[in-house]
Regions:
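Nucleic-acid endo/exonuclease domains
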Residues: 1-134
Length: 134
């Protein structure tokens, strides 16, 4: 019986966070480490018969972070089907995070590469908002 449950979509796949981080995700992870913020990678949230994974979960703050790379979420030309699926997945994640009581912070590749200090300010600001609510 255990094998069936473990292999089903009732439980999130194991060891998901062992997927290598992208360079952009590594930048955010390093920032979170520098800020001494405890986080987990690839936070699963149940959606219908499957799971949606969020890049980072700030454990003590109820904040999820998605790092949006330029290819999938940016201005680069891409097939309309790819753009449509990325937009649909983003909308689902936005809704799911809100439904589950998380604040979702989206960080664009351009922000990380061109204005890194703003990323630090955004994350710190959301943490401070969360602390003032509690």
């Amino acid at each position: 019986m255990k094998a069936k449950i473990r292999g089903s979509s009732l439980l999130p796949p194991r060891n998901r966070s062992r997927r290598p981080m992208t360079d952009l995700e590594q930048m955010v992870a390093d920032l979170l480490d520098d800020l001494k913020i405890e986080f987990e990678r690839e936070k699963p949230l149940k959606y219908l018969q499957g799971w949606r994974y969020f890049d980072f979960h700030l454990i003590e703050h109820g904040i999820l972070i998605e790092v949006d790379g330029a290819y999938w979420h940016g201005d680069n030309p891409k097939p309309s089907y790819v753009a449509m699926m990325a937009k649909k997945n983003d909308m689902i994640k936005n809704w799911l995070a809100k439904k589950e009581g998380y604040k979702l912070v989206r960080i664009k590749e351009k922000q990380l590469k061109e204005d890194f200090s703003s990323v630090k300010n955004i994350i710190s600001g959301e943490i401070n908002k969360n602390l003032s609510r509690n």
